[in-house]
UniProtKB/Swiss-Prot annotation:
SUPFAM superfamilies: P-loop containing nucleoside triphosphate hydrolases. SMART domains: AAA. Keywords: ATP-binding, Chaperone, Coiled coil, Isopeptide bond, Nucleotide-binding, Proteasome, Ubl conjugation. Homohexamer. Assembles into a hexameric ring structure that caps the 20S proteasome core. Strongly interacts with the prokaryotic ubiquitin-like protein Pup through a hydrophobic interface; the interacting region of ARC lies in its N-terminal coiled-coil domain. There is one Pup binding site per ARC hexamer ring. Upon ATP-binding, the C-terminus of ARC interacts with the alpha-rings of the proteasome core, possibly by binding to the intersubunit pockets. Consists of three main regions, an N-terminal coiled-coil domain that binds to protein Pup and functions as a docking station, an interdomain involved in ARC hexamerization, and a C-terminal ATPase domain of the AAA type. One of its GO terms (biological process) is proteasomal protein catabolic process. Pathway: Protein degradation; proteasomal Pup-dependent pathway. The gene is mpa. This is Proteasome-associated ATPase. Residues 1-29 are annotated as: Disordered. It comes from Mycolicibacterium smegmatis (strain ATCC 700084 / mc(2)155). There is a cross-link at K595 (Isoglutamyl lysine isopeptide (Lys-Gln) (interchain with Q-Cter in protein Pup)). GO terms for cellular component: proteasome complex. ATPase which is responsible for recognizing, binding, unfolding and translocation of pupylated proteins into the bacterial 20S proteasome core particle. May be essential for opening the gate of the 20S proteasome via an interaction with its C-terminus, thereby allowing substrate entry and access to the site of proteolysis. Thus, the C-termini of the proteasomal ATPase may function like a 'key in a lock' to induce gate opening and therefore regulate proteolysis. ATP binds at G300, C301, G302, K303, T304, L305.
Length: 613
């Protein structure tokens, strides 16, 4: 019988398996199986030969079954051997991996035409070769590379992500090096990594200017991630410290959203919008536009709202002049959180002010109006020499003065300040040429209060059916009557509305009513309280809609909440914040119904200013 005939019935590859790949025991067993299979095949051939009549059919089937069994056993053995071989290879790879020597890392400094590279590693600058699988032309300066035990570059990594923070002073003429200032004002020259070199071709500002995390061209003052040992700067780090203090937005507040301040709105539009919209006329008349505006007055009367509306209106008007789409109008409203500018480290507050104005100038140079709004201006720019626990104002105020009208001019930048203690702001800031325009935001009178109420009580609000019936279902007329009635109640000089009796230093006495301390914020609070009562009424009775009684009850509750707020410890300071100026106040007595007369107290020298209204 031929070799091919002997191999029939065995798995592929079995016939070629010899002692070279199997142990001696396995080879002997395979040889025995071969001989037995050959013998069985020979018996089978004899059984089906010319003398097959002497064999029974059952013997033939038994032989065939035995051959099949041997073939299956042979196949199973081959699978086991293959699996064992694969496991052996995997274990060998694991042993080789665990036995590899440690790899080092370095920073790529330069590449050369002969496929060698300069690498900084372990404090040394070395010229190394690269593995054949490394594309030297694709390597970038400043990139991290992995080295084997023979100091051959075997893998390219990313740029370093940790290191020291340094401030960029200037980029040198070659464009690949920069002067940076590190810890303790230490100056050093560093190389710029490839991403920073490529940033030279980017626009000077991102589309959203104050999104400092977006790629843009480097400029002095930027914070850079630096590896001082390798001498490389890898990345520009966004200045979160300034972003926390500056809120950049295009406000959505318009003049139509402000009630009761028509005269003040006209004043600020004349001061801010006219110079931007009619530059030619101002130039023809040699008229210099104002550099700043001060909004002062009692709390809650709309100073911040007006500042936001200025930015919104100015952006739209500029878009109209340029022929742009008003919906895409752009202006920048920098809302400076005044108290957060203060820092315990000497010079930090001044540095923040410099950065804010530097960035405002850069954006304004493109012709886009920039409004810098200082809220609570008295907190950081108070009169020099009046500090109790610190003298920080002696350096902060001069910094602002130099920014507003120093050697560097302010073009397309308007400074708006807001304060309810304008008497505490340094006079040098308030003089003409700095904050030129001073606009007093007064407390609303009855007419202004009706205008403010109309902003919150609109015709789309649900009104109770009984109130609508009185006006034959005319919703507009019903709302108007509600406003008139609630304003009459709020501004009536009746005993229920008496608030305080003040005694001046000259002995004169004056009764003050709640209307003397009204504000836009209080009116909004009254309306919100009435809406809450209407909601509770729906839940309790099922009757839906706002009623005039809800508004009247809200006025009573609002007045009751404010009866304990006047500061009787130092009434003169309290009166200044509340908007009452003039003769010095020495006594305050609350006149709210049900309040005892023991609340009267003389002014004394205590430094505690107490609760302000």
């Amino acid at each position: 019988m031929s070799e091919s005939e002997r191999s029939e019935g065995f798995p592929e590859g079995f016939a070629g398996a010899g002692s070279g790949s199997l142990s001696s025991e396995d080879a002997a067993e395979l040889e025995a199986l071969r001989r037995e299979a050959a013998m069985l095949r020979e018996q089978l051939e004899n059984a089906v030969g010319p003398q097959s009549g002497l064999r029974s059919a059952r013997d033939v089937h038994q032989l065939e079954a035995r051959i099949d069994s041997l073939a299956a056993r042979n196949a199973k053995l081959m699978d086991t051997l293959k699996e064992a071989r694969q496991q052996l290879l995997a274990l060998r790879e694991e042993v080789d991996r665990l036995g590899q020597p440690p790899s080092g890392y370095g920073v790529l400094l330069a590449t050369h035409d002969d496929d060698t590279v300069d690498v900084f590693t372990s404090g040394r600058k070395m010229r190394l070769t690269c593995s054949p699988n490394i594309e030297v032309k694709e390597l970038k300066q400043g990139q991290t590379v992995r080295l084997n035990e023979a100091l051959t570059v075997v893998e390219a990594g990313n740029f370093e992500a940790v290191g020291e923070i340094s401030t960029l002073r200037e980029i040198l003429a070659d464009g690949h090096r920069a002067l940076v200032v590190g810890h303790a004002d230490e100056e050093r020259i560093v190389w710029l990594a490839e991403p920073l070199v490529a940033a030279k071709d980017l626009p000077d500002e991102p589309t959203d200017y104050f999104d400092d995390s977006r790629p843009r061209k480097l400029r002095p003052g930027d914070s850079l991630l630096v590896d001082t040992k390798a001498g490389y700067a890898f990345e520009r780090i966004p200045k979160a410290e300034v972003e926390d203090l500056v809120l950049e937005e295009v406000p959505d507040v318009s003049y139509n959203d402000i009630g009761g301040l028509g005269r003040q709105i006209e004043q600020i539009r004349d001061a801010v919008e006219l110079p931007f919209l009619h530059k030619d006329l101002y130039k023809e008349y040699s008229l210099r536009p104002p550099k700043g505006v001060l909004l002062y007055g009692p709390p809650g009367c709309g100073k911040t709202l007006i500042a936001k509306a200025v930015a919104n209106s100015l952006a739209k008007k500029m878009a109209e002049v340029r022929g742009d789409d008003a919906r895409e109008a752009k202006s920048y409203f920098l809302n400076i959180k005044g108290p957060e500018l203060l820092n315990k480290f000497v010079g930090e507050t001044e540095r923040h002010i410099r950065l804010i104005f530097q960035r405002a100038r850069e954006k304004a140079s493109e012709g886009t109006p920039v409004i810098v709004f200082f809220d609570e201006m008295d907190s950081i720019f108070r009169t020099r020499g009046t500090g109790v626990s610190s003298d920080v104002e002696t350096t902060v105020v001069p910094q602002l003065l130099s920014e507003i009208d120093g050697v560097e001019g302010l073009e397309n930048v308007i400074v708006i300040g807001a304060s309810n203690r304008e008497d505490m702001i340094d006079p040098a800031i308030l003089r003409p040429g700095r904050l030129d325009v001073k606009i007093k935001i007064e407390r609303p009178d009855a007419e202004a209060a009706q205008d403010i109420f109309s902003k919150y009580l609109t015709e789309d609000l649900p009104v109770h059916a009984d109130d609508l019936t009185e006006f034959n279902g005319d919703r507009a007329l019903c709302i108007k009557a509600m406003i008139e009635k609630v304003v009459d109640r709020m501004y009536a000089e009746i005993d229920d509305n008496r608030f305080l009796e003040v005694t001046y230093a000259n002995g004169d006495k004056e009764v003050m009513y709640f209307k003397d301390f009204n504000s836009g914020a209080m009116i909004q609070n009254v309306v919100d309280r009435a809406k809450k009562y209407a909601i509770k009424s729906v839940l309790e009775t099922g009757q839906k809609g706002l009623r005039i009684q809800h508004l009247l009850d809200s006025i009573v509750d609002e007045f009751a909440e404010n009866e304990d707020l006047p500061n009787t410890t130092n009434p003169d300071d309290w009166a200044r914040i509340s908007g009452k100026k003039g003769e010095r106040i020495v006594y305050i007595r609350t006149l709210v119904t049900g309040k005892s007369s023991s609340a009267s107290r003389a002014i004394d020298t205590e430094s505690n200013l107490g609760q302000y209204l």
